[in-house]
């Protein structure tokens, strides 16, 4: 498969059909994205049940003879400042996904991006200084605004310039994830980065 370089239309980049020419497996992509989204949840929510809240364990009044409803504890969930019924506890939302499935989902996503012409390949994509205006002008020149930029190695200038832009993000190949890949209208990737992606997915 040949990909035309956007900044040099006379040059093409040869990539593997096995990696970038697959059918779109919607079920697999959905499963991997749900797993990824669940796994990044903190899961640190916590509440106190009736055994954990502070308060007396004494029975407020006797069981019978007062005319009032029977009560055994001031810490009951029915009472103000009592415990919480079915109190939330810290837990892990991690869902295991095999490496082969994860790689398969990434291959499927990249293949679909190419089919929909949403993957834009540049030989080089950099800015001279970490200035947001420079990045805005550069993206305006190539008519991209809702875009994920993927580089082979960390580019501090791009990262700093993109921090204050809506719907623009910069990631390295090692830090890209399936949710980011499908969250933007376009994915801009450098030729060195896509070669590294091919190495990782084969």
Swiss-Prot record:
Residues 45-71 are annotated as: Disordered. Keywords: Ribonucleoprotein, Ribosomal protein, RNA-binding, rRNA-binding. It comes from the Bacteria. GO terms for biological process: translation. InterPro entries: Ribosomal_uL4, Ribosomal_uL4-like, Ribosomal_uL4_dom_sf. Pfam families: Ribosomal_L4. The keyword Ribonucleoprotein applies. GO terms for molecular function: rRNA binding; structural constituent of ribosome. GO terms for cellular component: ribonucleoprotein complex; ribosome. Part of the 50S ribosomal subunit. One of the primary rRNA binding proteins, this protein initially binds near the 5'-end of the 23S rRNA. It is important during the early stages of 50S assembly. It makes multiple contacts with different domains of the 23S rRNA in the assembled 50S subunit and ribosome. Forms part of the polypeptide exit tunnel. Belongs to the universal ribosomal protein uL4 family. This is Large ribosomal subunit protein uL4. It comes from Buchnera aphidicola subsp. Baizongia pistaciae (strain Bp).
